[in-house]
Regions:
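Extended, composition-driven regions rather than compact fold-specific motifs
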Residues: 1-412
Length: 412
């Protein structure tokens, strides 16, 4: 039976909220595709960064008090280019605990990303990646619970729904993964990505989550870290591709997401949608608890759209992320299908061993040909975590200006 359309008077709070949603999407440059879904203005990296700009600006505004207090205390942990000796880089992982200055440093570094990062969900392992040669920060890593539904992951593993429900506990997602300046200028991002697959991470996982209860199921499970997923927010990644040391691949591309999500709904608009649901006494308005799953925000927006008579297809932004897997165990797929009982970590290297290989493979050669990293000053980091519009950081055009003018979004 066909669902009846929701009719809203033009002068109600609902109508004003709908106009705000349409105006926001129009400002970002979205239009309706032939099938009624949203069509993004472009798939270029510049356009994708521009689409995230308002969300990132809102986030930096929310954190400005923290940045103002933390930056003077923590700035010294970021390197000047002159302090980096590529041939002597010695990476070390430090597990971050909540409520520490290391946690503040992790938070500060994550705010420099051009695409806002997630806070993670459920189980979490957060790391600072240090260069023990100079005591400076190379980058950050955050591993957390994976999303339940990820088609390309499930297909490459060969999972049934029952398999996934029983064994997803053996999978993590790298939701933050990257290097900070000046290390990112000499392919430090490749080093950081490879450090995910190390003995130290395996041991930390086993110690912290080896005997755990499922966030959703509440059942006790003996978890063995078999596989880690990650995705590139800017389409195909030059950092993640060809990520191999010797004969061992560290990240393998397996396909793209289908472009569903909520990044195009910034925090300020999301707050208005929640307030609308609160006034309607809808259960999702204040339902964010870990046990309710990682997709609460998506479900909340969908519920608000449904109440407003907006098609849920407006949550399909069309920006597909390239998905990668890191097969932590050599028998990862068999273990996840239930064909093996015990994870085999054959050939798993230490942080020191991976660091030596990555240094020789990528960082030293890049530093020899691209010497601009030497000119980086740590004082420049402040511009990366400022909510003010920066010449170096803000896209020069809005998404709508990047491509030719298109038809505006009308109707629902």
């Amino acid at each position: 039976m066909k669902k009846r359309a929701v009719v809203i008077s033009a002068f109600t709070p609902e109508a004003r909220l709908k106009r705000r949603i349409r105006g926001h999407l129009r400002k970002l440059g979205f239009e309706h595709g032939p099938d009624g879904t949203l069509a993004p203005p472009s798939s270029s990296k510049e356009s994708i960064r521009a689409l995230h700009f308002e969300q990132r600006r809102d986030g930096l505004k929310d954190h400005r008090v923290f940045v103002r207090a933390a930056l003077p205390k923590l700035e010294a942990y970021f390197a000047n280019g002159s302090e980096v000796d590529p041939e002597k880089i010695q990476p070390r992982l430090e597990l971050v605990e909540a409520g520490t200055w290391q946690s503040d440093l992790f938070r500060l570094a994550s705010l420099s990303w051009s695409v806002p990062v997630s806070y993670g969900f459920g189980r979490r392992l957060r790391y600072l990646v240090w260069d023990d040669n100079n005591g400076k920060l190379i980058g950050i890593i955050a591993l957390g619970d994976p999303v339940y539904n990820l088609r390309v992951r499930d297909e490459v593993i060969g999972w049934t729904v029952k398999d996934r429900s029983k064994r997803l506990v053996n999978v993590l997602d790298a939701y933050v993964l990257g290097a900070v300046p000046p290390y990112n200028m000499i392919l430090g991002g490749k080093l950081v990505a490879c450090l995910v697959r190390t003995k130290e991470v395996r041991d930390d996982f086993a110690r912290k989550y080896g005997n755990t209860r499922g966030i959703i199921s509440k059942k006790k499970k003996r978890a063995q870290l078999a596989l880690i997923t990650t995705s590139s927010s800017l389409g195909r990644s030059s950092v993640y591709n060809r990520l191999k040391l010797g004969s061992q691949p560290y990240l393998t591309p397996i396909g793209y997401t289908q472009g569903w999500g909520h990044f195009h709904v910034p925090d300020s608009l999301f707050a208005d949608l929640r307030d609308y649901l609160r006034k309607k006494r809808h259960g999702y308005w204040d339902g964010h608890k870990f046990g309710e799953g990682p997709n609460w925000r998506l479900r909340t927006i969908r519920a608000a759209f449904d109440a407003l008579g907006i098609k849920p297809d407006w949550l399909k932004h069309g920006i597909g992320r390239e998905v990668y897997i890191c097969e932590f165990a050599s028998n990862a797929r068999k273990l996840l299908r239930g064909e093996s009982k015990k994870a085999i970590y054959r050939g798993l290297k230490s942080v020191s061993e991976v660091g030596a290989l990555a240094r020789a493979r990528w960082m030293v050669p890049r530093a020899q040909t691209r010497t601009e990293y030497k000119d980086w000053k740590r004082e420049q980091f402040a511009a990366l975590v400022s909510f003010r519009r920066s010449r170096n950081e803000e896209p020069t055009n809005t998404p709508a200006q990047i491509v030719r003018k298109r038809e505006t979004i009308t109707g629902s």
